[in-house]
């Protein structure tokens, strides 16, 4: 899978990313709008967590571009294109967890990851492998449509391998 996005170095554990994630999202609206416009997608946003070490990890907001949109990246001004990079997700096995459907499912991601790591993983016969973690935000929205707006959810993809 090839995604296009932008990153920031987060400190600490992915179990505690909520505040950093919120601040990053609020501070980078322009980048989000550029990518959404280029790929014509505003309901599916990817979060990529990679390059983990004792201090933290790289956190990306990214989008999956159609081939034609990736080719169009060559035609945008250099100062804009330099804000973004391609992130290649290697093939491998992932376990996928989902949040409940609600208006703000991103607020449920830290709790979901904590439960997956502390409750599911120890008894599963699997361990985390060295690959990016993926969050997929399904951010449906239509003005005045509470049923749709409350059906948003997130997927958490954890890279795993048999012990």
Which positions does each model-derived feature cover?
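A solvent-exposed interaction/effector surface
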Residues: 1-163
């Amino acid at each position: 899978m090839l995604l296009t996005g932008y990153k920031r170095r987060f400190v600490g554990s992915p179990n505690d990313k909520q505040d950093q994630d919120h601040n990053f999202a609020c501070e980078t609206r322009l980048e989000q709008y550029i990518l959404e416009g280029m790929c014509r997608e505003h309901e599916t946003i990817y979060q990529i967590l990679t390059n983990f070490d004792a201090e933290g990890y790289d956190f990306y907001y990214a989008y999956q571009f159609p081939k034609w949109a990736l080719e169009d990246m060559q035609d945008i001004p250099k100062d804009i294109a330099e804000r973004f990079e391609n992130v290649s997700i290697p093939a491998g096995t992932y376990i996928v967890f989902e949040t409940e459907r609600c208006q703000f499912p991103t607020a449920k991601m830290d709790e979901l990851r904590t439960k997956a790591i502390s409750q599911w993983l120890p008894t599963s016969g699997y361990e985390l492998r060295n690959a990016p973690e993926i969050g997929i935000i399904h951010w449906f929205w239509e003005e005045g449509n509470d049923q749709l707006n409350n059906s948003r959810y997130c997927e958490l993809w954890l890279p795993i391998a048999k012990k």
